[in-house]
From Swiss-Prot:
Alphabetical list of HAMAP family matching this protein: NusB (MF_00073)
Physiological role: Involved in transcription antitermination. Required for transcription of ribosomal RNA (rRNA) genes. Binds specifically to the boxA antiterminator sequence of the ribosomal RNA (rrn) operons.
Keywords, ordered alphabetically: RNA-binding, Transcription, Transcription antitermination, Transcription regulation
Protein name, per record: Transcription antitermination protein NusB
Taxonomic placement: Bacteria, Pseudomonadati, Pseudomonadota, Gammaproteobacteria, Lysobacterales
Segments of this protein annotated with the region Disordered: 1-20
Length: 159
């Protein structure tokens, strides 16, 4: 077995820092679903995280990253919404619930997870919007995040 894949559930090469990109993608997809469920139900965030983590444990695989994303988004929602606000064409609560969940997750990663390259954040968000969102939702998500990244990741985006 290749040393880069040994012991990793996805079987794909991992980065030097030990991160398995496939497992992170799964964690992001599940986080989008959990954020969506939280937005719709308005229920207790901690209970939702625990329930979702328990039910989805096999699929998530990178449970620690899923939980970090969930706590990050829920604990910083107002700040994330404010950071995204100037790049939206309407209030955040008026954005379709799936696209809103995708934007909040990506907004969290752009603002707080500087270990994740902004292009990865945007690409993952586009893929989630394509998978779960409306027909053209990914185009909207891409436009918002491209503009937001210029401000939130000035050094990285070269502006």
């Amino acid at each position: 077995m290749n040393k880069n894949t040994q012991g990793k559930p996805s079987g794909k090469p991992v980065r030097r820092d030990g991160v398995d990109p496939v497992l992170r993608s799964r964690a992001r997809r599940r986080a989008v679903q959990a954020i969506y469920a939280w937005q719709i139900s308005g229920g207790n965030a901690q209970s939702l995280i625990a329930q979702f983590a328990h039910e989805q444990a096999r699929e998530i695989a990178d449970l620690a990253y899923f939980e970090a994303l969930m706590h990050g988004v829920l604990d910083n929602r107002r700040d994330i919404d404010e950071a995204l606000g100037p790049y939206l064409d309407r209030g955040i609560e008026e954005v379709d619930a799936i696209e809103r969940a995708v934007l909040r997750l990506a907004g969290y990663e752009l603002r707080y997870r500087l270990d994740v390259p902004y292009r990865v954040v945007i690409n993952e968000a586009i893929e989630s919007a394509k998978r779960f969102g409306s027909e053209h939702g990914h185009t909207y998500v891409n436009g918002v995040l491209d503009r937001a990244a210029v401000e939130l990741r000035k050094v990285e985006s070269g502006h």
